[in-house]
Amino acid sequence: MNTDASRLRWRCRRGMRELDQLLGWYLDTRYAGSDDAAKAAFSTLLDQQDPELWDWLMGRTPCEFLPWRRIVDEIRTRDHI
């Protein structure tokens, strides 16, 4: 694993195991094949607070920022959440 991926892996570790799993899934299965804009969006998405991420991923509140919403939607459709 390269240094950037290792840093992202660490940043995917959250205060909730469920978030760890969802964000880790994206990193493991989608990140490498993403374009540079999506990679940058994922990195900034990881700067958000856990409660906000959780609400977006559970569909409780909409994610208004389009680049993040694309990632959130992809994660949500992974398990038909």
Regions found by a protein language model. Name each.
Residues 1-81:
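Positively charged, polar, low-complexity stretches
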